[in-house]
Amino acid sequence: MSLSNKLSVKDLDVAGKRVFIRVDFNVPLDGKTITNNQRIVAALPTIKYVEEHKPKYIVLASHLGRPNGERNDKYSLAPVATELEKLLGQKVTFLNDCVGPEVTKAVENAKDGEIFLLENLRYHIEEEGSSKDKDGKKVKADPEAVKKFRQELTSLADVYINDAFGTAHRAHSSMVGLEVPQRAAGFLMSKELEYFAKALENPERPFLAILGGAKVSDKIQLIDNLLDKVDMLIVGGGMAFTFKKILNKMPIGDSLFDEAGAKNVEHLVEKAKKNNVELILPVDFVTADKFDKDAKTSSATDAEGIPDNWMGLDCGPKSVELFQQAVAKAKTIVWNGPPGVFEFEKFANGTKSLLDAAVKSAENGNIVIIGGGDTATVAKKYGVVEKLSHVSTGGGASLELLEGKDLPGVVALSNKN
């Protein structure tokens, strides 16, 4: 799956055409009030660009929450239509469904350049292909119904644009099922692909990956794939304790230990050696007597280990120095997962120091990419999103890319040629 060879919105001629844009308007709601409109704002450049190029009409489609294949007013996109009108400064016609006669009739009578927002795609089981019954058991959608649903979505479009990177790892109907000749990436999707291509297809070296997070078992595939690509790998966060216990027989007290992941540590370290990857682990820790923002704190080195009833919640000053040295050497950096419990101020120093080093690296012209999820939250919390090369909008999608998996939503896009 090539990331750098996908058709982009700028390669399209949309004049007089019916344009379908899959956006990510999965915004947090409090009742009918949108509490954060960032995802809507992020989609504006693509919508405005298409609108400026005189399409017949634009149809916007998204999911919101998990309505589980049935209509549920709690997950209606109606409030999004109102917000979008404000942001665009023009009328947005909200349709009460995403397929069916009402939708067909509305688009057939569209005024030139009209913008429609469809109701939540996930009101139909055919979007995700399955739902859960009241006992939590998976119920599969009828394949014929899925086919019909996809045909109905396709009938609204001459051109398809996908700007929902956060859902790109899901083979949902609106992501892979529109059979039109040109399927292009919107500006958000294009930026994601461009930066991940810079890291995964043709990185400037030295290439450093920074991994944090709790469980080794969640990140085995990620570490395994990155060991074929990087020159240096920092393993921090909770999963460092599993590595330290297995490799150095270090006492870790009540720190996180991942029984399942532990079985893979030696194989991963062997692979790092074989591939000449410098593996960098923390050598000292900020410890706590409990998992709490008001915990008593102490410090421990890896030579002493962490005493019983204490746990490591951040890396210590010597580790910070090691990590900063690696960052200073690197020309390409991918960071997924914080090195400490940054949510508690007492254990945020490791994360803040690493973030400062990453910002400095980006300011020096290096490529610094933050995978979505917790690390993106860190970048937002400390107000440095604009200072880094790229902060991904898709936690799960960016993780699967870094694991070396193909993303169905990207595979479905047309290639440039």
Swiss-Prot record:
<feature type="binding site">
    <location>
        <position position="38"/>
    </location>
    <ligand>
        <name>(2R)-3-phosphoglycerate</name>
    </ligand>
</feature>
<dbReference type="GO" id="GO:0043531">
    <property type="term" value="F:ADP binding"/>
</dbReference>
<feature type="binding site">
    <location>
        <position position="238"/>
    </location>
    <ligand>
        <name>AMP</name>
    </ligand>
</feature>
<feature type="binding site">
    <location>
        <position position="39"/>
    </location>
    <ligand>
        <name>(2R)-3-phosphoglycerate</name>
    </ligand>
</feature>
<feature type="binding site">
    <location>
        <position position="26"/>
    </location>
    <ligand>
        <name>(2R)-3-phosphoglycerate</name>
    </ligand>
</feature>
<comment type="pathway">
    <text>Carbohydrate degradation; glycolysis; pyruvate from D-glyceraldehyde 3-phosphate: step 2/5.</text>
</comment>
<keyword id="KW-0134">Cell wall</keyword>
<dbReference type="GO" id="GO:0051701">
    <property type="term" value="P:biological process involved in interaction with host"/>
</dbReference>
<keyword id="KW-0418">Kinase</keyword>
<feature type="binding site">
    <location>
        <position position="374"/>
    </location>
    <ligand>
        <name>ATP</name>
    </ligand>
</feature>
<feature type="binding site">
    <location>
        <position position="342"/>
    </location>
    <ligand>
        <name>CDP</name>
    </ligand>
</feature>
<dbReference type="InterPro" id="IPR015824">
    <property type="entry name" value="Phosphoglycerate_kinase_N"/>
</dbReference>
<feature type="binding site">
    <location>
        <position position="63"/>
    </location>
    <ligand>
        <name>(2R)-3-phosphoglycerate</name>
    </ligand>
</feature>
<feature type="binding site">
    <location>
        <position position="213"/>
    </location>
    <ligand>
        <name>ADP</name>
    </ligand>
</feature>
<keyword id="KW-0547">Nucleotide-binding</keyword>
<dbReference type="GO" id="GO:0009986">
    <property type="term" value="C:cell surface"/>
</dbReference>
<feature type="binding site">
    <location>
        <position position="218"/>
    </location>
    <ligand>
        <name>Mg(2+)</name>
    </ligand>
</feature>
<feature type="binding site">
    <location>
        <position position="23"/>
    </location>
    <ligand>
        <name>(2R)-3-phosphoglycerate</name>
    </ligand>
</feature>
<feature type="binding site">
    <location>
        <position position="65"/>
    </location>
    <ligand>
        <name>(2R)-3-phosphoglycerate</name>
    </ligand>
</feature>
<dbReference type="GO" id="GO:0030445">
    <property type="term" value="C:yeast-form cell wall"/>
</dbReference>
<feature type="binding site">
    <location>
        <position position="237"/>
    </location>
    <ligand>
        <name>ADP</name>
    </ligand>
</feature>
<feature type="binding site">
    <location>
        <position position="238"/>
    </location>
    <ligand>
        <name>ATP</name>
    </ligand>
</feature>
<keyword id="KW-0324">Glycolysis</keyword>
<feature type="binding site">
    <location>
        <position position="213"/>
    </location>
    <ligand>
        <name>CDP</name>
    </ligand>
</feature>
<dbReference type="GO" id="GO:0062040">
    <property type="term" value="C:fungal biofilm matrix"/>
</dbReference>
<dbReference type="GO" id="GO:0005524">
    <property type="term" value="F:ATP binding"/>
</dbReference>
<keyword id="KW-0964">Secreted</keyword>
<feature type="binding site">
    <location>
        <position position="214"/>
    </location>
    <ligand>
        <name>ATP</name>
    </ligand>
</feature>
<feature type="binding site">
    <location>
        <position position="218"/>
    </location>
    <ligand>
        <name>CDP</name>
    </ligand>
</feature>
<feature type="binding site">
    <location>
        <position position="343"/>
    </location>
    <ligand>
        <name>AMP</name>
    </ligand>
</feature>
<keyword id="KW-0460">Magnesium</keyword>
<comment type="similarity">
    <text>Belongs to the phosphoglycerate kinase family.</text>
</comment>
<dbReference type="GO" id="GO:0006096">
    <property type="term" value="P:glycolytic process"/>
</dbReference>
<dbReference type="GO" id="GO:0030446">
    <property type="term" value="C:hyphal cell wall"/>
</dbReference>
<comment type="function">
    <text>Catalyzes one of the two ATP producing reactions in the glycolytic pathway via the reversible conversion of 1,3-diphosphoglycerate to 3-phosphoglycerate. Both L- and D- forms of purine and pyrimidine nucleotides can be used as substrates, but the activity is much lower on pyrimidines. Negatively regulates the biosynthesis of acetyl-CoA from pyruvate in the mitochondrion.</text>
</comment>
<feature type="binding site">
    <location>
        <position position="24"/>
    </location>
    <ligand>
        <name>(2R)-3-phosphoglycerate</name>
    </ligand>
</feature>
<keyword id="KW-0961">Cell wall biogenesis/degradation</keyword>
<dbReference type="GO" id="GO:0046872">
    <property type="term" value="F:metal ion binding"/>
</dbReference>
<dbReference type="GO" id="GO:0052553">
    <property type="term" value="P:symbiont-mediated perturbation of host immune response"/>
</dbReference>
<feature type="binding site">
    <location>
        <position position="312"/>
    </location>
    <ligand>
        <name>AMP</name>
    </ligand>
</feature>
<protein>
    <recommendedName>
        <fullName>Phosphoglycerate kinase</fullName>
        <ecNumber>2.7.2.3</ecNumber>
    </recommendedName>
</protein>
<feature type="binding site">
    <location>
        <position position="375"/>
    </location>
    <ligand>
        <name>ATP</name>
    </ligand>
</feature>
